């Protein structure tokens, strides 16, 4: 079992900081490349650029919770939720939001 984790590509767990604007405010987010790849995939399936997807997600969390605590951790957890969904969910949710920020 440990081989599965130990032999993963080093690139997947290397960190990268990306700068973006959310509601006109410049910010930077540091995540491991595996998470950035997953977020790019989600954004693509939603038909959005990564920046637009992250802005939408941020706004949804803000609307639901009134504030956003630790957005980077929320993004990691969102990726875990996305990756844990069975393939059938993707077919069932086609045409509807695939990832609701408040989940």
Where are the model-predicted features located?
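Short, positively charged interaction helices/loops
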Residues: 64-103
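Amphipathic, hydrophobic secondary-structure cores in small proteins
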Residues: 21-74, 79
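Non-catalytic regulatory/interaction regions at protein termini and inter-domain linkers
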Residues: 11, 15, 54, 58-60, ...
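Short Lys/Arg-rich basic patches
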Residues: 4-30
């Amino acid at each position: 079992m440990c081989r599965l984790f130990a032999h993963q590509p080093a690139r997947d767990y290397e960190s990268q900081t990306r700068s973006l604007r959310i509601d006109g405010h410049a910010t930077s987010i540091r995540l491991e490349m595996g998470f950035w790849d997953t977020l790019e995939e989600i954004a693509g399936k939603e038909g959005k650029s990564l920046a637009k997807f992250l802005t939408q997600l941020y706004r949804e969390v803000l609307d639901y919770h009134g504030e956003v605590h630790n957005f980077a951790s929320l993004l990691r957890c969102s990726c875990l939720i996305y990756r844990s969904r069975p393939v059938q969910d993707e077919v069932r949710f086609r045409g509807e939001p695939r990832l609701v920020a408040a989940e």
